[in-house]
C-alpha cells in the first residue's frame, strides 16, 4: 500500500519538474556542454571519470561530472568526490527524489548532452534523467516514458554491463557517427 502512495507522489513530482526541452539526436559538432552522471559504486569509476575528462578536453567540450554515491560510509571512510557534485542517499527526500537545489546546474541550465552512466532503474536516476534539461540524452537503463534518446546496454552474452569504460567508448563512437 505504501508503495502505491509513494508512486503516486513520485509521478506528481516528475510531472512538476519534467523537462519540457525537446530532445533528439544531435551531431557532435553542435554539442558544447555535456553533463555526465557516474555511479561511484561501480568498479573503476575514477578511470571512467578520467576518460570523460580527457574526451571533453580533446573534443573542446565543457564537461560537468555528477556522482551518485549511495554507499553507507563508515566513520573511517571519506567521500571520494566533491560534495557539491555528489548525490548522497541522505540527500534524498522520503520519496527518493534528489534535492533540486543541490544540482541546480543539472536541472536548470540547458546543456547539449546528458550521459547517464548509472546502470540501474532506481527512482533517483529516473527523476534526474527525466528532469535534466538537455537536448540529447544518453543512458544505460530504459525508463517508462522515454527518458533517453539513446539507451546503450550490454549484450546478454557478455559482461558489458559491468564495464562502464567500454560502454562510454561505445557512446563516443556512436556520437561520431551522427551527422
List each model region and its residues.
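Structural motif
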Residues: 112-115
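Active-site-proximal region of nucleotide-activated glycan assembly enzymes
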Residues: 146-179
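Active-site proximal beta-strand in glycosyltransferases
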Residues: 135-145
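Glycine-rich, highly charged phosphate/nucleotide-binding loops
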Residues: 16-21, 86-104
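Histidine-anchored nucleotide/phosphate-binding helix
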Residues: 42-61, 65
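Short internal beta-strands
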Residues: 62-70, 138-139
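Short N-terminal or domain-adjacent regulatory/targeting segments
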Residues: 1-33, 43
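An aromatic- and histidine-rich active-site surface loop
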Residues: 119-132
Amino acid at each position: 500500500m505504501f508503495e502505491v502512495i509513494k508512486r503516486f507522489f513520485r509521478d506528481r513530482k516528475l510531472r512538476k519538474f519534467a523537462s519540457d526541452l525537446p530532445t533528439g539526436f544531435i551531431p557532435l559538432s553542435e554539442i558544447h556542454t555535456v553533463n555526465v552522471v557516474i555511479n561511484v559504486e561501480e568498479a573503476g569509476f575514477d578511470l571512467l571519470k578520467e576518460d570523460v575528462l580527457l574526451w571533453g578536453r580533446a573534443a573542446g567540450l565543457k564537461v560537468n561530472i555528477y556522482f551518485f554515491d549511495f554507499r553507507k560510509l563508515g566513520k573511517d571512510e571519506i567521500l571520494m568526490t566533491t560534495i557539491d557534485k555528489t548525490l548522497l542517499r541522505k540527500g534524498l527526500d522520503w520519496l527518493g527524489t534528489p534535492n533540486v537545489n543541490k544540482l541546480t546546474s543539472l536541472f536548470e541550465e540547458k546543456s547539449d548532452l546528458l550521459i547517464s552512466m548509472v546502470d540501474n532503474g532506481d527512482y533517483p536516476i529516473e527523476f534526474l534523467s527525466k528532469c535534466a534539461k538537455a537536448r540529447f540524452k544518453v543512458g544505460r537503463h530504459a525508463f517508462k516514458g522515454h527518458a533517453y534518446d539513446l539507451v546503450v546496454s550490454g549484450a546478454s552474452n557478455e559482461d558489458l554491463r559491468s564495464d562502464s569504460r567500454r560502454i562510454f567508448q561505445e557512446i563516443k563512437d556512436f556520437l561520431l557517427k551522427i551527422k
